[in-house]
Regions:
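Asp-based, Mg2+/Mn2+-dependent phosphohydrolase catalytic module
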Residues: 1-5, 9, 110, 114-115, ...
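Residues within well-ordered alpha helices
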Residues: 25-26, 52, 67-68, 99, ...
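Structured helix-beta-strand junction loops
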Residues: 103-104, 130
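Conserved, well-ordered alpha-helix/loop/beta-strand core segments that scaffold catalytic motifs
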Residues: 99-100, 106
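Σ70-family region 2.3-2.4 aromatic/basic alpha-helix that recognizes the −10 promoter
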Residues: 94, 107-110
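A generic structural motif
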Residues: 104-105, 182
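N-terminal helical cap/lid subdomain that shapes the substrate entry/recognition surface
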Residues: 2-95, 102, 114
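Residue-level recognition of short, well-ordered coil/turn positions
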Residues: 58-59, 105, 139, 158
Length: 209
């Protein structure tokens, strides 16, 4: 098997801890029933439309906060930041990405935006320093699973899809990448994700640098 030479990573839920526990913790803090966010924002047609517009950059995070808050019955102030307040770096995947880069793999980020102000999901992660390419959906008026957004990431890396691995915690986006020629990896347990990446890239991703 020929090994891949590029690695494209989703951000939230891959280089961070999982999203769902953070959302559930927010619901508990706000006194909401469990599953309220999923129902209002990801199952409701209007909620889905709002999130897609945010990801494409056609509305701001503040506009999203103000539109989403009444659907949940909560205050709009920094709503996105409150929802994801419990997210933390997923250190094992961050370290694995760094190991891949040291081994000569080109490593890029491809993330659907949640807006950048007033709360910035990417603060403190030094994306522009640590990765060869950073593609945030709102900057391109697109969102995963749009094929054109994957093409932006590939162009920045200077690689073809069949030279790359794509990692995401959302199965729909993994499948979209696979249709383009990427080797897809669904991120669930970090240890399993890293083991799969080692097999696809042909380089060790754990241990001291």
């Amino acid at each position: 098997m020929s090994h891949r030479t590029g690695l494209v990573l989703d951000f939230g839920g891959v280089l961070t801890t999982p999203l769902l526990p953070a959302v559930l913790a927010f619901e508990q803090r706000e006194g909401l029933p469990q599953g309220a966010c999923i129902t209002a924002l990801y199952m409701d047609e209007e909620g889905v439309r709002l999130t897609h517009e945010l990801e494409r950059g056609t509305i701001s995070q503040t506009e999203w906060n103000e539109a989403a808050a009444p659907k949940l019955g909560v205050a709009p102030d920094n709503l996105m930041g409150r929802i994801f307040a419990d997210l933390r770096p997923e250190r094992s995947l961050i370290d694995a990405a760094a190991a891949a880069k040291r081994a000569g793999i080109k490593v890029g980020i491809l993330s659907n935006s949640v807006g950048l102000t007033p709360w910035n999901l990417y603060d403190g992660y030094e994306l522009d320093v640590l990765y060869d390419s950073v593609v945030i959906s709102e900057s391109h008026g697109l969102r995963k699973p749009d094929p054109e957004l994957f093409e932006v990431a590939l162009k920045q890396l200077g690689l073809a899809a069949d030279e790359c691995v794509f990692v995401d915690d959302t199965e729909e986006y993994v499948q979209a990448a696979e249709k383009l020629g990427f080797a897809g990896v669904r991120a669930q347990q970090p240890e399993q994700t890293i083991a799969r990446l080692e097999a696809l890239l042909g380089v060790p991703l754990t241990g001291a640098p």
